Amino acid sequence: MEKSLLFHFRRIGVEFIIFSVYAVFSISWAATGSLMPLISNDLALNTQQATLITSMIVVAKIFGASFTAFLVYKFGLKKGYFLGCILMSSGIFLSFVDSYSGILIIRFLTGLGSACALVCLVPIAQQWFEKKALHFVISFNITSNLVGITLGLVLAESISNYFGNWRDSLSFYAWINLILLILWLFVGKDENKKEEKKNNAKDLIYALKSRVTWGMIIFYIGPILFLNSLFTFLPTFYAQYAGFSKELADFAKKEIPALANFAIIFGPYLGLFFKRKNISFKIMLLSGGACIFICGFCMLFLQNLVLIQIFAVLSGIFYSM
């Protein structure tokens, strides 16, 4: 791997872009949940319709891995990443779309793009970094989701107030991603190995036929829906249905999702500990899913804020275990 000064500047630029793209998406995703009362009032939506706006991203993520594999195989990593992630910038049209169905389509496209951004974090890092640096960069990139969601929960209302409406504030994040992806065209690179495409085709077909692939996809639908509910349904639940005072509800709807997402950092360490104790991955998946269900139940029906905070932290740990 070349070590010129230009190379180092270029890979710093690449790292900044791929981290920021997914972080900005995560800000937008979390902000949508925080702004859902405004969106619901503006569009006259019921609870089910409002939930579907954010759930469309989850639905798209289910198909996103296969979609990304096809793009990378067909166009290479540089163009595939660009074409996939550019779908996230479809949010720039939120300012002009008035129909509920149009918004759902934009959210679905955004979800497909976000899946591409997430899946490509590792292969892009492998292009530019080696050994210890690579492990650090991959771990660092994973936190982009946490950073984005936390910023979204904290800043969503302030940014919306600055723009004066929820449409322009959500479009703002899409414009940022569009600028980042244009920069990507100048710093990204493709592999020049002719045999790689053949190998990728075999790997893609094998992965699509694998029972493990589809089993993992089906299993993670539940945890992803839970993660989605943390910053979509829960803030609305605490504000309107939990019976909390206004001050307590305003505190809970921001802190509880933030705590759960912060705790996600520590889940892999618990998983590694159990793995060293020779506990199988299958058992960890099943027990982790059951614990997430218990934590979610307690977060909904407990009235003690301290206990809700504890179960929020535990839910984040079990989610990423």
Curated annotation (Swiss-Prot):
UniProt membrane topology term: Multi-pass membrane protein
Disulfide bonds: none
Keyword DNA-binding: no
Primary localisation category: membrane
GO function terms (MF aspect): transmembrane transporter activity
Keyword vocabulary terms for this entry: Cell membrane, Membrane, Transmembrane, Transmembrane helix
Subcellular location: Cell membrane
PROSITE patterns referenced in this protein's UniProt entry, alphabetically: MFS
GO cellular component, one term: plasma membrane
SUPFAM superfamilies the record matches: MFS general substrate transporter
Keyword Transmembrane found: yes
Pfam (any one): MFS_1
Cited InterPro entries: MFS, MFS_dom, MFS_Efflux_Transporters, MFS_trans_sf
Transmembrane domains' residue ranges: 12-32, 52-72, 86-106, 109-129, 136-156, 168-188, 214-234, 254-274, 292-312
PANTHER family given in the database record: CHLORAMPHENICOL EFFLUX PUMP RV0191 (PTHR43124:SF3), PURINE EFFLUX PUMP PBUE (PTHR43124)
Protein name (database record): Uncharacterized protein Cj0987c
Gene source species: Campylobacter jejuni subsp. jejuni serotype O:2 (strain ATCC 700819 / NCTC 11168)
Source organism phylogeny: Bacteria, Pseudomonadati, Campylobacterota, Epsilonproteobacteria, Campylobacterales
